[in-house]
Amino acid sequence: MGRSLKKGPYVDPKLLKKIRELNEKGEKKIIKTWSRRSVIVPEMVGHTIAVYNGRKHIPVYITENMIGHRLGEFAPTRTFTGHRIPTARITAIK
């Protein structure tokens, strides 16, 4: 189930405060955050937010197409290295 419409989208209060301060000053700095669950709102457009993926912060530039999605969607947490090839097949190929 999604979040109730009467509550509105969840945005981490500290992150929203930082965004509003930068908008007032007219600055564009990279903002580090651990809040992957925060929803992208129109105030964030044009900013770069470094989202933590469990190992490092991934810089995400916010565009209009991202509004309504969550920050965590743009910072993958798992690295896929591919499936293992059986050793018998490797020797047959050579």
Curated annotation (Swiss-Prot):
<keyword id="KW-0694">RNA-binding</keyword>
<dbReference type="GO" id="GO:0019843">
    <property type="term" value="F:rRNA binding"/>
</dbReference>
<dbReference type="GO" id="GO:0015935">
    <property type="term" value="C:small ribosomal subunit"/>
</dbReference>
<comment type="similarity">
    <text>Belongs to the universal ribosomal protein uS19 family.</text>
</comment>
<dbReference type="GO" id="GO:0003735">
    <property type="term" value="F:structural constituent of ribosome"/>
</dbReference>
<keyword id="KW-0699">rRNA-binding</keyword>
<dbReference type="GO" id="GO:0005737">
    <property type="term" value="C:cytoplasm"/>
</dbReference>
<dbReference type="InterPro" id="IPR020934">
    <property type="entry name" value="Ribosomal_uS19_CS"/>
</dbReference>
<protein>
    <recommendedName>
        <fullName>Small ribosomal subunit protein uS19</fullName>
    </recommendedName>
</protein>
<dbReference type="InterPro" id="IPR002222">
    <property type="entry name" value="Ribosomal_uS19"/>
</dbReference>
<keyword id="KW-0687">Ribonucleoprotein</keyword>
<dbReference type="GO" id="GO:0006412">
    <property type="term" value="P:translation"/>
</dbReference>
<dbReference type="Pfam" id="PF00203">
    <property type="entry name" value="Ribosomal_S19"/>
</dbReference>
<dbReference type="InterPro" id="IPR005732">
    <property type="entry name" value="Ribosomal_uS19_bac-type"/>
</dbReference>
<dbReference type="InterPro" id="IPR023575">
    <property type="entry name" value="Ribosomal_uS19_SF"/>
</dbReference>
<keyword id="KW-0689">Ribosomal protein</keyword>
<dbReference type="GO" id="GO:0000028">
    <property type="term" value="P:ribosomal small subunit assembly"/>
</dbReference>
<comment type="function">
    <text>Protein S19 forms a complex with S13 that binds strongly to the 16S ribosomal RNA.</text>
</comment>
